Amino acid sequence: MTNYIISLLFFCVSVSFLYSLGFTLTKSVSEFSKNFILGFIFYFSTISVFLILIQLFKLPWIFALYSVVTIVIILSVYIIVAFIKNKLCITKKDFISIVKNNYFSIFCVFLLYCIYLLQFDLIWINNHLDDGYYLTKVATLPYLENPYITNYSTGLLNISNGFDSYLLSSYETHASVYRYLLGIDPVVFCRFFMNIFNYFLAVCTVDWFAAELNKRMAYRISKSMIQFCSMVLLIFAFEYTTLARTGLLMVQDSWQFSSAMWYGSSIPRVMGLLWLIVPFINREKIQLKDFVYVTICSFVLIACSSIALPIIVIGGISYLVAFSVTANQKNIRIFTVIILIFVILSGWILPDSPQRSAVIKSFMSQDLKSILFVGSILVTAISVIIFKNRFINRTIITIITCFILMFVPEINDFFEKLSIYDFVYARAQTCFIYTFIIFSFILFIFIFNYLLKNNLKFIIVFSLCLLCSLSILSVIPVYGNPMNIYKIMLNNSYLMPNSTIDLSKQLQSIAEIYNMDLNVLTPEWASVENHRHSLSVMIRTYAPNVNSISAIGRFGVTEGNAFSSYTSDDTGIYNSFCEVQNTQTIDAFKQLLNEYPINCLVFTGDFFNEYSTEFGYTFEKKVDNYYIYVKNNS
């Protein structure tokens, strides 16, 4: 419980700090969401400059801690000075107004997190094993001798001749500093605090977007009603296989919104395009300082995850096209034409990527048949007819241009090459589809506000009840009774199987007792609460002095260490021995242990007892249903 209390207190402090930082930039006390987002962008850009340099030069992790603490102190002093110098203050009336206009934002985060807890299978398999990298990185960075050339899931050195793009992302390093300083359990920190923080970022982004659009509407929504636009995010939290099976929405890695929102990549994938265009939706003229904002924002998005690059480039060009059509600024039009010529020429010169095109066309062909996507198109078309609003049209043109740049042959070749990987290009498509659905839902609210003459209460309540009901119903066919799922999560209150936590801590204890690093073979998968659980990729969460050799099958291994030739076939030898002990499997397993310096074995049963002396291992400890053996004289 202490971990959750500290996390909630830290969440409140973080929101207050970032809002205050944004307030010093805007001088507008009432624009809570805008201040919070701008405060985050300002803060994270400043922090990331130093953290990325530390990573590129592979300096000790302690420099990251010193950098974060120093910058937070400097920014705190800046906030105080700015408040005094500019006579800024938040009165009791201002505070009440902020709460009144944003209380649903917190409630929406609560709903999203409740839905997250229902994604039981994804949590148990650690988000398709990806948590084995990201969560373990946050947990172990402070304790690693080589923090930026380590495979965080295996614990082995990750030596590569090529450039590691992960060094451009400061997100996990930044998170590791606060987790270390606060002493919060790493799993709770990632799956609770970071989840609710990123959900809150998304909610505030939608609120800011809606507020900016609302400024140019003839029939404006009251400030207290704008916050309800964020309920659209509940759609993305539907169980991902249900979304795909029903044809409601097909996008790359849709499961990440409902179960891995805490990932750094979730920020550009969900919010990237909106952060780039929202400040300029209502602009009549673009100035040089606006390019400065876009540059800083782009840097922040890349610092969260390098998948942001195609989102930034496609989104930026698309907005320039939309602005050139809806505004009268000659120099921007010329600049846009030059960029488009460059993109088209590059597309003709660069070779096509048929596989990359096929991936996104497959998703899009499914979405064009979905009720959700077709409904979004209809709502958008109706809004064009009803409102005849130049600034709404600008956003529509921006989104349409994004899809054109992604799908039109030859033109899209430049962006396909820019993405490097298929999944990166597909995630950019996810961002644009999410943005379109968010935009159309806001227009849906605007249309009913116009038709009902500012009497939105019924449609808001109806929409919220419908979305909440559907989000729960989407889970039931996959995971069963929600109450049973909540009971399981309550029994495993650290959001990871208790047995895995106990095993990880015990392995670290053994490593400390024997004063050595453990090279451990464990089952890749285990059954916990009658569900599959990916064990091997997570045992390092509490054990920085343990190397999980069984995780090599998922995360690979590079040259330069004793396990460079180890493959998933070798893990198969271990698995075969676990399944049946006969002359063939015993000899193969003995040969494997002689070939590699594996000094610790974990089995789900005591069948190794009769072979341990022959193999040169001693029984060390039983943890839940796991039996730990350590090599003699190791």
Positions of predicted regions on the chain:
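Perimembrane helix-loop-helix junctions
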Residues: 311-340
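Membrane-embedded, hydrophobic transmembrane alpha-helices
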Residues: 1-99, 346-360
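Membrane-interface alpha helices of multi-pass inner-membrane proteins
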Residues: 55, 290-307, 317, 337-345
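Extracytoplasmic
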Residues: 478-634
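Active-site lumenal/periplasmic loops and adjacent helix-entry segments of GT-C-fold
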Residues: 113-263, 267, 271, 482-496, ...
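Membrane-interface transmembrane helices that cradle and orient dolichyl/undecaprenyl
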Residues: 268-292
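Signature aromatic-anchored transmembrane alpha helix within multi-pass, membrane-resident enzymes
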Residues: 337-341, 447-479
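Membrane-helix boundary/interfacial segments in multi-pass membrane proteins
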Residues: 5, 56-64, 126-127, 243-268, ...
